[in-house]
Amino acid sequence: MNDAECLSHLLQVCARKTEEFVRTLDSKHMVWLLEIEEEARKMFSSDFNAEPELMPKTPSQKRRRKKRTSILPDENRDPSGRRISRRQSNASWSSSVRRLSVRNQNKANDDSIQEEPAQLKRMTRARAQASIKSTPVLETALPESPSQICQKNAQVKISEQERRSAEQKLIESDFELKTVPEITKDNVSETVNSAVPAVPVTPENKSRAAGKLKIAASSTPEQKAEMVDLTCESPRPANEQQLNLSNQSATPTGSKSDRRSVRRSLVVRKSSSRRASLASQFSLASKRESMTREAVRKSIRQSISQKKAAMEISSTSSQRSYQSSIEMVDDEITIKIRPETVPSETVSEEAPAAESPRRSLRSRAFKKIAISNLPDSEEPPRKVTRQMVAGNAEPTPETTEDAQNIRRKSYKRAVDELSDDERPSEEERSPPRKKTPSPPCPPSKIVRPPPHMKSFLHTVQKNQLLMMTPGSIGKNIIMKSFIKRNTPLKTDPKTEEKERQRLDALRKKEEAELQRKQKIEEGKKRKQEELKVRREERLRKVLQARERVEQLEEEKKKKIEQKFAQIDEKSEKVREDRMAEEKAKKKMTAKKQEEVECRRKQEEEARRLKVKQMEEEERRHQELLQKKREEEELERQKKIAEAKRLAEQERERQLLAEKERLRAEREKERIEKEKALQLQRELERAAQEKEQQRREAEERKKREQQERLEQERLRKEQEAKRLQEEEQRKAKEQAAVAASAPVMNVTVDMQNSPACESYEMTPKSCKVPSVKVNEDNYGMDLNSDDSTDDESQPRKPIPAWASGNLLTQAIRQQYYKPIDVDRMYGTIDSPKLEELFNKSKPRYFKRTSSAVWHSPPLSSNRHHLAVGYGLKY
């Protein structure tokens, strides 16, 4: 039983831990993951169809003094806010038209502005509670027609795609107005004001402040942009106040009074319920909204400064500026309608009933929310002009078509007449012109846009170039011209070359300026992010300190209430109530105990059944395990028998292999022995053959020597016979001469007489060649360049040990068994330098050479150095 309880407790703990983990995932991690996914989707799905932001300020624009205009400008003051130029008559008509439109707008807004109190008061807790109790729900009647809304509100600038979607929304709302009956006054009083956006109620839309509308700056460069919050006047819920507080973390940009009112409003707004968590206050959504606000502020300030500078330059062309100012005024008066600002009847029919309807006008500057881009509609855009709104009538097709023509005409003219800086890029992108020039056009007919339009279009095109990606170049960068150029083509090649060089230089300057601006912008962004992080940290610390103060106040309040409760408990009535409560509690506890006991019995019965089931399952499990063990044992025995059989086979195979190896070794040894015996026999036979050859050679030499001696002896004998015969013949001749000559006075030469030389006194000895005693002494001559030194035909026979198998055996034996040289010849001692150089004269330790080295005696340059140059003797 104890094990079953432990098991159930363990299951409960696991279930609780799992629920906590899932709750943590849903409340913390999934929020961050969803926001990261949203940011990634925005990054990868941006199509660059939205209106580009204006270019950032240059350093020269930053150094200019900012002109602060009041939130409620004086109606007698010129709203342009620029200096009176020397030629003010050119733009007087356009400025007067703008002044009249601004005065009408201010008169229409006077009533709504007076509803806002002049200054926010510091509210105590009691005053806040009293105001919550006493403030009634105000009923605000809707305006009679959408023209009143358009008159009260400032101009709303939207993009072209939002204009198309608004047109489609207007068509749908007109169709619904025809089908749906009129709404009663009671329902009208409960609906939201016309400024509330008609969007479906989603968690994302609930999290934002309801009914904020972005009122951007008008086209006149002197007006300052405002954000008007058209919400209801009843007190806000706590979550909306907290969201507004997180949105106001950015630095206010209004006047000092506005900043003071912001601080007081931060002090006044204390949450009546629990505060939002820090994750919701410092989430990516609030950071994204604050970054959007900063970007819009920057773009509005830059557009105002650029338009101011452009209006000062615009006084040069009087007629062109007159015509363009008419067109620009018409464009400025045009009201661009979003789906959020459709007529009040459509809003009241489609929007759900608001929590507490209220309507207030907040004049703090640049307070807004980012509105996402709406998808393009296939319907053509339609505009409602201010003249149509003043007539309290729906826009007729004729007026709409006129407004479209005016707008299209000025747009085409502005696109066609770009500034000179942008013209080369347009010529490169446009298709090649015709070879035949167009007919000449007088300069008076050439219409150019006003300078402020030039600078605006130039800025927009630069922004488009900055925001381009490689995939969007083919779609967005090519701007096609819809108007045929009327200026004649110049065919002067020198002028064209100069123009091309000037345009190349200008393009290079623009690229360098663009890179510099990008670097400056990156530095600005990095500094702004650092400032934003510091500001958020500071705000978080302030909020934490405020929460701590509130906690201390709540603890004090709880202590006071506890004291009052202790005092009240002393009374009799409290005691009676307590006794009654105790009786009721006892009844409830008894009832609960009975229920617990019944539940315990049921649980005990269920536990008992569960234990029985578990025991049955355990028994079946044990039986299965026993069967499995038996099967495993059989399988193991089979495996062991198989392993033994395989081992026996392996052992037999190894024995056979060993026997085969031994037999192969014995066979190999036998073959080697036979080879050695055969080699020895061959060596002996070769030695015998050599010895026999040597003996035959010696015998042959002896025979040749004997034959040579015999021939020499025979030759000498023949020579001796020939000499003897010669002498005998001479002697006979002399005897004959002597016999014939007289005997007296005859001198006889005794020296040449044959009697004296009858035999050889000392015969010449012949040198017999000595026989070699040492066969290894071949008597190799020192000069080996004689004609008999031929390796193919040596003069002397090669010994047996220097060729054949004996040489191979000797080399093999010397390789495997090298000769111990130290044992044969003894160890060689290292030489002692003292014994070699034992002279002690001091001059041997000096360098006494008188040589002068002009260059180092290297081996590379030693052979070509002259003696007189290298050494002195």
UniProtKB/Swiss-Prot annotation:
Gene Ontology molecular functions: protein kinase binding
InterPro entries: INCENP_N, Inner_centromere_prot_ARK-bd
Biased composition, class Basic and acidic residues, residue ranges: 286-297, 491-535, 566-584, 591-649, 683-733
Alphabetical list of Pfam families matching this protein: INCENP_ARK-bind, INCENP_N
Compositionally biased region (Basic residues): 60-69, 261-270
Disordered: region residues: 50-124, 237-270, 282-452, 484-535, 566-649, 683-736, 781-800
Name used for this protein in its record: Inner centromere protein A
Phylogenetic classification of the source organism: Eukaryota, Metazoa, Chordata, Craniata, Vertebrata
Name of the coding gene: incenp-a
